């Protein structure tokens, strides 16, 4: 039986449907599981003694462009598993995922490229589907990053039960600070503040400043600033830039939109505040400015990434109404899974 026939057969569809029921019970902002497509030749499936399919996966390989900004956000070579585990939350899900990860480990062990230092085995698992955590830890994965979500009022209505994701009331900037929409003349300041964020996040194992990072970030911000009414803001104390925020409108955020079940989705790419200004309300005012504009534009949900172990990110984004939607688990190098 071919990998394609396994991934698209009735048993795989049933496993995906059961996983979807578990996801929605855990978090109404999650999407329905998408059908799996064969992107490697490994048959990743786990069955019960009677033949019932318990878990199935599809693996893919991403090799970074050395000049692209994407390379800054993780390993240069990423092996990613999309997993569908059948059944309700509980020990059976943990066991089935553990066995599936073991099969994937065997596949990666057969690939010489997975043993290189700048590689990662990656799996996105719903943050509130806690049945997967023990299996991932057992196999040598670490929770490096989070995709967090903040539903707007309209988005919360669309996803029944997600009302707790709606953010706080609008925050005004602290005294002496003004927030304005960025212009092309602000490019240098935006890049400088953005690099501070990247360099701080690099302490936590996910983000890496590359030789191409400055040029790639400059090109990314320049392209965003060329759009009409860009979702980019600068916070200034007097004439001194002290904070920035860059976000993608739903039209530009299609790449991450499938990670949630409500639409349209925007993406907060990067927000940074000068270290001397942290804790004073600049970041909250920037996040509030972006959320207000996104809601006025009809956005249902805002997504963003933050480093799981960054001691500043998790409490800050929680205070702004964001909560974990997906956890990005990584094993580095990819061939070193247990």
Identify the function of each model-found stretch.
Residues 57-59, 146, 233, 243-247, ...:
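Conserved GNAT-family N-acetyltransferase fold
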Residues 1-17, 178-193:
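A short beta-loop-alpha structural element at the N-terminal edge
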Residues 7-40, 201-220:
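Conserved GNAT-fold acetyl-CoA-binding loop/helix
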Residues 169, 174-266:
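Flexible, substrate/cofactor-facing loop regions flanked by secondary structure
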């Amino acid at each position: 039986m071919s990998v394609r026939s396994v991934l698209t057969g009735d048993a795989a569809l049933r496993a995906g449907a059961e996983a979807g029921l578990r996801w929605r019970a855990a978090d109404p902002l999650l999407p329905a599981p998408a059908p799996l497509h064969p992107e490697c030749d490994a048959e990743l499936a786990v069955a019960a003694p009677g033949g019932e399919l318990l878990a199935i996966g599809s693996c893919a390989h991403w090799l970074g462009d050395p000049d692209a900004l994407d390379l800054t956000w993780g390993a240069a070579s990423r092996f990613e598993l999309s997993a569908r585990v059948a059944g309700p939350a509980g020990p059976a899900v943990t066991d089935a995922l553990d066995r599936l990860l073991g099969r994937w480990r065997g596949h990666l062990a057969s690939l010489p490229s997975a043993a290189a230092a700048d590689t990662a085995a990656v799996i996105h698992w719903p943050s509130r589907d806690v049945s997967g955590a023990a299996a991932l830890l057992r196999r040598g994965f670490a929770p490096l990053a989070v995709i967090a979500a903040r539903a707007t009022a309209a988005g919360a209505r669309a996803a029944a039960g997600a009302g707790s994701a709606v953010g706080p009331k609008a925050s005004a900037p602290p005294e002496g600070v003004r927030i304005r929409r960025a212009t092309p003349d602000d490019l240098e300041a935006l890049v400088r503040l953005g690099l501070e964020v990247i360099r701080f996040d690099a302490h936590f194992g996910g983000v890496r400043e590359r030789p191409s990072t400055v040029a790639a970030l400059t090109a990314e911000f320049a392209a965003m600033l060329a759009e009409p009414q860009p979702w980019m803001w600068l916070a200034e104390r007097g004439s001194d830039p002290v904070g920035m925020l860059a976000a993608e409108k739903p039209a530009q955020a299609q790449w991450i939109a499938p990670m949630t079940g409500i639409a349209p989705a925007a993406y907060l790419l990067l927000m940074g505040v000068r270290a001397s200004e942290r804790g004073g309300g600049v970041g909250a005012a920037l996040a509030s400015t972006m959320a207000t504009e996104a809601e006025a534009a009809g956005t249902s949900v805002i997504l963003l990434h933050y480093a799981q172990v960054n001691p500043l990110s998790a409490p800050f984004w929680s205070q702004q109404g964001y909560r974990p939607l997906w956890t990005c688990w990584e094993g580095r190098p990819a061939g070193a899974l247990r």
